[in-house]
Amino acid sequence: MKVVKFGGSSLASAGQLEKVLNIVKSDKERRFVVVSAPGKRNAEDTKVTDALIKYYRDYVAGNDISASQSWIIDRYAAMVSELGLKPAVLEKISKSIRALATLPIEDNEFLYDTFLAAGENNNAKLIAAYFNQNGIDARYVHPREAGIVVTSEPGNARIIPSSYDKIEGLADSNQVLVIPGFFGVTKENQICTFSRGGSDITGSIIAAGVKADLYENFTDVDGIFAAHPGIIHQPHSIPELTYREMRELAYAGFSVLHDEALLPAYRGKIPLVIKNTNNPDHPGTRIVLEHSSDKFPVVGIAGDSGFVSINMSKYLMNREVGFGRKALQILEDLNIGWEHMPTGIDDLSIILRGRELTPIKEEEILRQLVQKAEVDHVEIEHDLSIIMIVGEKMKSHIGVTATATRALSENKINIQMMSQGSSEVSIMFVVNKDQEKAAIKALYHAFFDESKED
């Protein structure tokens, strides 16, 4: 029994939907289909979700909504026409889109989510109708019926654990169930969305709920690459990752899969595979609990920019009980989150994302660290990047760190800081932002096929 999720690029046009139909038809185990809203048909096109955002803004601002409404309805109309679906399918979708502009604006914290969810919801109706017209016994299932009950946090909903009891009942159906992704319903029956890209989360929730044998996530790439294709020309694809490795890579900039989507499948011990709708025979990248082999110590190199470091020093810092707590309390009081905290005997650095800071907050941090923590020296360093070498099997291979530092040194890349967690799933290097790409290239060629030059 498999749960299949298709992203927006896989559902952008009638031609893409034909591929989806064939994929579902080719395997009778694909019994649950989770869908996104239609994505871009080409680089100049607009995603339906973005069009719904414009529609919402026009509506709440009291602007003319006719153009926004018409564009969205016409987008679905084109697919209905090209797929040869019955007019009643478009009538239902059109009615749903127009009904959004009758909802109350005042005291309606879920209005924005309701608008956004319409993209997935109406696409699921269309796809269920298309399946039924082409030999698949399918049924559209609203998240309310599916049992996806979520917290009342607009734009950041989380599944309520008790929901899984009802979701499990979906497995009793003999039909192919088509479920819109991205949103659930609250206990008060309000539509509430996950964070953007949340259809991945829905797929993972359904997979965990029905105890699927596999969760297949179809997108527009042949799985996950060992480095960003925009930096490394034709990087290796990764055949297998663990959930822990995927989490590390997602944190450091890999955006193939919504990182929150890993949690339900991970807890449910459901293997996941990233596959390509346009190349479905490619094996893709499989995400599992444990590796089947320890042949490759490093599975991927990832980098992300926009970090800053608060660097402080104090003589005999290591003997002062509670120093770290004082420093972090200052950040907490200013509502500032942090990412990493490399330390020495008499020095400590707190790495955080630059978006957490403002000039006023920076001044306050410096002032309070001097006053409350009595540091000898403190400075804030900007424009930093984090580079992650990821691989659970690094801990059983000698010389991985030496290989990495040698590669960076030979390419004249200055390592500002380095850190490795106790789990040894990743090694983190902090470098200047202008050396990020060079660092990724150096590390990639040190651990992977050096014949693949840019």
PLM region spans:
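Structural motif
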Residues: M1-K2, R30-V33, D137-R139, Q175-V178, ...
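A conserved regulatory-domain signal marking ACT and ACT-like small-molecule sensing domains
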Residues: P283-D454
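Surface-exposed amphipathic alpha-helical tracts and adjacent flexible/coil segments at the periphery
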Residues: L257-D259, G268, N278-T285, P359-E362
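Positions that flank functional sites
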Residues: A146-G147, D222-G223, P280, D346, ...
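Glycine-rich beta-alpha junction loops
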Residues: P38-G39, V221-G223, L272, N276-D281, ...
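Nucleotide/pyrophosphate-binding catalytic subdomain
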Residues: M1-H258, L262, V430-N432, S451
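Active-site-proximal loop/turn and secondary-structure-junction residues that shape catalytic pockets
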Residues: A37-K40, F183-G184, N278, L316, ...
